[in-house]
């Protein structure tokens, strides 16, 4: 039996992270490499990164507890 390939962790370019803001609060975002998400602490949302592309749509974001 073979194990499925692990999802390669990607990083977000620092300059891109400086430019991107939360579309809800216009506040800063933090990169969570393990979950491949951009976190908005102000909005309590986690925006997914799919195939290296941040999905900055509030309806696609995961709500944080």
UniProtKB/Swiss-Prot annotation:
Signal peptide range in chain numbering: none
A GO CC term assigned to this protein in UniProt: cytosol
PANTHER family xref list: PROTEIN PREY, MITOCHONDRIAL, ZGC:162634
Sequence similarity: Belongs to the UPF0434 family.
Descriptive protein name: UPF0434 protein RPB_0294
Species name: Rhodopseudomonas palustris (strain HaA2)
Lineage: Bacteria, Pseudomonadati, Pseudomonadota, Alphaproteobacteria, Hyphomicrobiales
């Amino acid at each position: 039996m073979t194990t499925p390939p692990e999802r390669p962790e990607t990083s977000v370019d620092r300059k891109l992270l400086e430019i991107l803001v939360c579309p809800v609060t216009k506040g800063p975002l933090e990169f969570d490499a393990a979950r491949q998400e951009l976190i908005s602490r102000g909005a309590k949302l986690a925006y997914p990164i799919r195939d290296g592309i941040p999905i900055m749509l509030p309806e696609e974001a995961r709500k944080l507890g």
